[in-house]
Design a protein with these regions (language model features):
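Small-residue-enriched hydrophobic alpha-helices in membranes
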Residues: 1-27, 34-142
């Protein structure tokens, strides 16, 4: 079992739900919550052993402030950094990073004690990773 999954499973279900609600909120930020995004979040809910009721709660569109308050309860820095990374990946998935997505990721990070320069560092790492993946497709003629 990887370190992140281990950390997630140590948290109570309420905290795991809060973590996943952040994904739902970010996925809705561009006005479109498609089936691929829903499937991705459902699979994460299964991986993190969230109950069916908890999974339904994840898909209820909570207000930003409520999500932020719930995320403040998560004290693991490792989980916070992982959440920022995953939110950055999700935000870049459609090749359009909106101001609303950027603001939400910043608010999440700050609520969880992640410094703005660390959030920027993670975001830049995600962008570099995406660029390398695209370059690999060209190099290996995929």
């Amino acid at each position: 079992m990887d370190q992140h999954l281990e950390e997630m499973l140590k948290m109570d279900e309420e905290s795991r739900i809060a973590y996943l609600k952040a994904f739902t909120r970010l996925a809705c930020a561009d006005g479109s919550f498609d089936e691929n995004e829903k499937r991705f979040i459902k699979n994460l809910a299964k991986t993190y052993h969230v109950s069916e009721d908890g999974t339904a709660e994840i898909f209820s569109c909570a207000e930003d402030d409520a999500i932020i308050e719930d995320l403040k309860k998560i004290k693991s820095r490792r989980v916070a950094l992982e959440l920022i990374k995953e939110l950055c990946i999700l935000a870049h998935a459609d090749d359009v990073l909106t101001d609303e997505e950027t603001l939400f990721i910043g608010r999440v990070g700050q609520a969880m004690g992640v410094e703005l320069d660390k959030i920027e560092q993670i975001s830049n790492w995600v962008i570099d990773k995406i660029i390398l993946a695209e370059e690999a497709k060209i190099i290996f003629e995929e």
